[in-house]
C-alpha cells in the first residue's frame, strides 16, 4: 500500500496503536503459570474494546486471535493449554484490521530469567537487527538493503537469519506487495522503496538454523535442530524523514 491521504495515515496509525497495545499488554501478562489461551483472551477483549478484528482469524481462519510461539515454536503457534514457565522464550505476533486497514507486529522475549543465555541473546540481536534495518528505510533506496542490514547484524553476533520467513507489504490487506522483505541480501531484488509505502519488517534471528519447517500441527513452524529463534516486527511507513512505525508506542 502507498499512503496518499491523511485519512489513510490516521487509519493506519489507529490500527497500529491497537496492535501495539495488545502486544504490550499480552507481554506484560506473560508470567509463569499462565496459559497461552489465557493470553490470547486478552487480545480478544482488547480487539472488541477498540472495534478491531483479528487478522489471522479474518484472513486465514487461524484458531486464535494471535500467534503465540514458545521455545521450539518459531512462528504461528496456536494459543491453547500450554503453560508458560520461567525461562521460556516466547514470541507474540499480533495483526488486526479496522475499517479496512491493517497492522502487524511481534516481539520475542524471555520470561523471567533463563539459565540459557542464548535465549536472551537472540532477542537482543533481533532488536539490533531491526534498528539497523530502519537506518536503510528511505524513499528511493533498495528494499534489499533491509535484508543486508539484518543479515550483517546476525553475522556480527555469530548468529543466523531464518531465510524462509520474511517481512511483507501490508496496509489494505495483511500480505500485499512487496511479497517479501527478506532477512538477507538478495542481489537480484532491484525493488526501490517509495514514499508512503507500508511494509512489515520482521527479522528472525537464530542460534544456528537458517530455515524453518512445519511443526507439530498444520500451523506452527519449528527448526529441525531446535535452535532458538527470536523475531521483532513492526509496521513501517516509508517517509522522506525516515521510517514511521505505526506499531510503536512512544514511552
Swiss-Prot record:
Organism of derivation: Staphylococcus epidermidis (strain ATCC 12228 / FDA PCI 1200)
Molecular-function GO terms, alphabetical: initiator methionyl aminopeptidase activity; metal ion binding; metalloaminopeptidase activity
Catalytic activity: Release of N-terminal amino acids, preferentially methionine, from peptides and arylamides
UniProt similarity note: Belongs to the peptidase M24A family. Methionine aminopeptidase type 1 subfamily.
Quaternary structure note: Monomer.
Residues that hold a divalent metal cation 1 according to the record: 93, 104, 233
Cofactor or coenzyme needed: Co(2+); Zn(2+); Mn(2+); Fe(2+)
Top enzyme class: hydrolase
InterPro entries: Creatinase/aminopeptidase-like, Pept_M24, Pept_M24_MAP, Pept_M24A_MAP1
EC number(s) from the headed UniProt entry: 3.4.11.18
CDD domains to which the protein is assigned, alphabetical: MetAP1 (cd01086)
Keywords: Aminopeptidase, Hydrolase, Metal-binding, Protease
Protein name as annotated: Methionine aminopeptidase
Cofactor binding summary note: Binds 2 divalent metal cations per subunit. Has a high-affinity and a low affinity metal-binding site. The true nature of the physiological cofactor is under debate. The enzyme is active with cobalt, zinc, manganese or divalent iron ions. Most likely, methionine aminopeptidases function as mononuclear Fe(2+)-metalloproteases under physiological conditions, and the catalytically relevant metal-binding site has been assigned to the histidine-containing high-affinity site.
Job description of the protein: Removes the N-terminal methionine from nascent proteins. The N-terminal methionine is often cleaved when the second residue in the primary sequence is small and uncharged (Met-Ala-, Cys, Gly, Pro, Ser, Thr, or Val). Requires deformylation of the N(alpha)-formylated initiator methionine before it can be hydrolyzed.
Amino acids binding substrate: 76, 175
Binding-site list for a divalent metal cation 2: 104, 168, 202, 233
